[in-house]
């Protein structure tokens, strides 16, 4: 059994180390309304379509309770739409600064292509957002063969539709000849729901939530503890494999092929 394609996530996986572009904006749109949310809370739904992310935040019990304290009622769909529109407006202005490929990604992509592997991608960003990110990333040397956004399919993650559309456009089947790699719980669910080999990448991920500088300066024991927490979270949510850096991906691929593994 040969792996024929790899489907990559974007922010936190191939670009934007630590997935910081949307984080501050999510926190800001709530803070402006007198509702303080933590970075950990803001990251929890990461990987979803962004309006679904806003909605998921409003449904968290602590945030909903705080909103009720401030406004005397729970968030409405109108509130969600208003916050999402504000989120988009702010995010569009900063996205170009968060499109640089993560260290080592371009080299791994080049190596995969030398093997004849096709490169697809999925995202929680809208098509309009990705027009900005993909253009800037391409200028810096990263351009997958195909990109699918939630706008292109009936629903985003955790549904498998973006992966299926990649498979159709890349001409690869069955789905167990493909790997899905990402940095969030919703990525793991997307890959498993699509029937693909699913890999979670830890360093640079939204789930780890650390900048490169923080990783470099953190006590090794503390960093290892945080890495293992994320690793376990990925596995609990369906990851077949976890890797700390993208450079380990080809080893995983070779293991699948050599051992003739079967998705369970």
From Swiss-Prot:
Gene3D superfamilies: HAD superfamily/HAD-like, Putative phosphatase, domain 2. The active site is at 9 (nucleophile), 50 (schiff-base intermediate with substrate). Its EC number is 3.11.1.1. The keyword Hydrolase applies. It catalyses: phosphonoacetaldehyde + H2O = acetaldehyde + phosphate + H(+). One of its GO terms (cellular component) is cytosol. GO terms for molecular function: magnesium ion binding; phosphoglycolate phosphatase activity; phosphonoacetaldehyde hydrolase activity. Mg(2+) binds at residues 9, 11, 183. Its cofactor is Mg(2+). It is an enzyme of class 3 (hydrolase). Binds 1 Mg(2+) ion per subunit. GO terms for biological process: DNA repair; organic phosphonate catabolic process. It holds the Pfam family Hydrolase. SUPFAM superfamilies: HAD-like. Belongs to the HAD-like hydrolase superfamily. PhnX family. Homodimer. Involved in phosphonate degradation. This is Phosphonoacetaldehyde hydrolase. It comes from Bacillus cereus (strain ATCC 10987 / NRS 248). The gene is phnX.
């Amino acid at each position: 059994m040969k792996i024929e394609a790899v489907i990559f996530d974007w922010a936190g996986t191939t670009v934007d180390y630590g997935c910081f572009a949307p984080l501050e904006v999510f926190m800001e749109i709530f803070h402006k309304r007198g509702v303080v949310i933590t970075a950990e809370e803001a990251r929890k739904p990461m990987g979803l379509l962004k309006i679904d992310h806003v909605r998921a935040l409003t449904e968290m019990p602590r945030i909903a309770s705080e909103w009720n304290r401030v406004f005397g009622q729970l968030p409405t769909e109108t509130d969600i739409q208003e916050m999402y529109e504000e989120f988009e407006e702010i995010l569009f202005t900063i996205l170009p600064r968060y499109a640089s490929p993560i260290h080592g990604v371009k080299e791994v992509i080049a190596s995969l292509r030398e093997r004849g592997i096709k490169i697809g991608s999925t995202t929680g960003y809208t098509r309009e957002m990705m027009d900005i990110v993909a253009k800037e990333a391409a200028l810096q040397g990263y351009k997958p063969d195909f990109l699918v956004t939630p706008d292109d399919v009936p629903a985003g993650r955790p549904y498998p539709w973006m992966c299926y559309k990649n498979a159709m456009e890349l001409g690869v089947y069955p789905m167990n000849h493909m790997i899905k790699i990402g940095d969030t719980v919703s990525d793991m669910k997307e890959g498993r729901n699509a029937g693909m080999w699913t890999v979670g990448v830890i360093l640079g991920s939204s789930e780890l939530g650390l900048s490169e500088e923080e990783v470099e300066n953190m006590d090794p024991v503390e960093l290892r503890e945080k890495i293992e927490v994320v690793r376990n979270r990925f596995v609990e949510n369906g990851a077949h494999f976890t890797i700390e850096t993208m450079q380990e991906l080809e080893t995983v691929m070779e293991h699948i092929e050599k051992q003739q593994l079967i998705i369970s």
